Amino acid sequence: MVKNYEEIYGKDELYWGAAPSEIIKRFGELAPVGAALDLGMGEGRDALYLAGLGFSVTGIDATKSGVSKCLELARKKELDVKALSADVRKFKIAKNRYSLIAAINLFQFLPKAEAQKIINSAIAGLKRGGLFVCESFTVDDPHYKAHKKSSKEIAPGTFLDSSGNIYSLYDYGEILKMCCPQFGNTKAQAQLRPVHYAEYDYYDTTHGPAHWHGVVDFVGKKL
């Protein structure tokens, strides 16, 4: 079951902590400083980090409590962050505007077709040389077997649970081909050059009891 993040982010503590995600910390500085977009930003840990690097950041999250917390932290730290409570699927990404677009732990909560639309819009929204950074969960994640047993699989790797929540887990190489279709179809025009791609098991100690995830990371540079 998908957690109630509106309620979680409404608490005083930072659920994910104050430190940025490892992939943003590792690759954020490789993007040319300019406008950045954080899709599904949560409480804004990556948005705040990028603003600290000098980016002018727009963060989008469905939760009002997450947005409120991010804006308060940005005010206290005097950082350039604009945060909006909105459905990322309906947010219109301006073309050729951003130096970096991030979607960290977003795509597991969307049908894969909708994730693909966001990826396509993000690629169009990047300036030449800009970076697209995303992270999600793979079929090696324990949630995959759990959903296979208890949820309805409405598309390969995408499940509808008993509460009506969507959960998607990505097969080997799937995110790479979604971001860089030239790897699945040699006739497809390349728009991103992969900078980093990894699938791995991750022991998560950042929130709640320690647990395992199957993770996929992708970083691509706009050609």
Short names for language-model regions:
Residues M1-A31, L37, G42-K92, L110, ...:
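Class I (Rossmann-like) S-adenosyl-L-methionine-dependent methyltransferase catalytic domain
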Residues Q116-R128:
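A short glycine-rich, Lys/Arg-flanked "PGG" loop and its adjoining helix->strand segment in the class I
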